[in-house]
Amino acid sequence: MLKEEDKIFTNLYGQQSYDLKSSQKRGDWYNTKALIDKGRDFIIDEVKKSGLRGRGGAGFSTGMKWSFMPKNSEKPCYLVVNADESEPGTCKDRDILRFEPHKLIEGCLIASFAIGANTCYIYIRGEFYNEASNMQRALDEAYKEGLIGKNACGSGFDCNIYLHRGAGAYICGEETALLESLEGKKGMPRLKPPFPAGFGLYGCPTTINNVESIAVVPTILRRGASWFAAIGKPNNTGTKVFCISGHVNKPCNIEEVMGVPLKELIEKYAGGVRGGWNNLKAIIPGGASVPLLPKSLCEVEMDFDSLRTVGSGLGTGGIIVMDKSTDIIYAIARLSKFYMHESCGQCTPCREGTGWMWRVMMRLVNGNAKKNEIDTLLNVTKEIEGHTICALGDAAAWPIQGLIRHFRDEIEQRIKSFGIA
């Protein structure tokens, strides 16, 4: 359980104002110049020592990612913050953007300094109108007070931060598709290599980080890497904002330690499963793109490694709870439709496969299929997984794989009830 004094996002519910003065009372922008004066190597080393792993889903070491940037680049360097939060069941970054914008802006300044970038872009989801408005007001305040811009915080470092609104494409949450969109092109993922650290925005060295990953950096530097590393579990350190939605009594966002038991999160903060824990059917633990877990596995600890051992993943930390009233086959079919709709169409396995999977899933929903089609569907998901430029193909395949792994009997019963053997 996270102690009150260890919380990083103290205004996650918007109970206080998000303006500069209120944010400073909560500790934001405190002696930022002193943190910058410690130098780039110190900042990167502290972030590495803290064990901070990317909070956008991949879980890659944030400090390690920063260290890939060239030290003496002839080209300008860029920091890009991925605020294109579009994963079904995920809304953690949304609350940070609207209620804790100054934490993000301060984090952008420090991260930009650490990687040698004088320009930062915050790419925000197009539908986040109010969040974009709050962010822009916060940026205007920071510029007015000299916290960012020329000679930011009196540090001698120039850093301009710009807000760029997306246009509603889920695929632009993929880092290279996001860069394409920023450049004014159609949001389609790039082949890697080259990686963004060598050839990113406008062909220049670029680091792309998630909102939460950047927003926690100032607090880590103030309190020390050892403080952050002592929270959570080895290799899964610090705090994490979890989103709990679906069939719970009180849907909410909550900051807790990495490794907190899934059942404890739901019982303590979300008022429990609707109808009690025994009424639980399944949980998607990390946003729509990770495989679901049946009730028997739902007391797992919420961290990257523990969830991997049970065949799922932490992803974004978006917990979707489904009780026994759920048509689990239709629920996953609905996700299949989402991924079919959001595929950019660049890769054949994803372009053709997502539509094919959705059509088969809808037949399974009705039971109008043959039993051998279950294995055919599973085989197709494995042909898509790992055979596309970006991870959208994997994201479309994994929910179906989880469904077949844990609820094959229910699919077969649906087919039997329809009357086709």
From Swiss-Prot:
Highest taxon above the source species: Bacteria
Transmembrane regions listed in the UniProt entry: none
Amino-acid positions noted as binding [4Fe-4S] cluster in the UniProt annotation, renumbered to this chain: C344, C347, C350, C390
UniProt catalytic activity: a quinone + NADH + 5 H(+)(in) = a quinol + NAD(+) + 4 H(+)(out)
Gene Ontology MF annotations: 4 iron, 4 sulfur cluster binding; FMN binding; metal ion binding; NAD binding; NADH dehydrogenase (ubiquinone) activity; quinone binding
Residues reported to bind FMN: 166-213
Protein name, per record: NADH-quinone oxidoreductase subunit F
UniProt organism field: Rickettsia prowazekii (strain Madrid E)
Recorded name of the encoding gene: nuoF
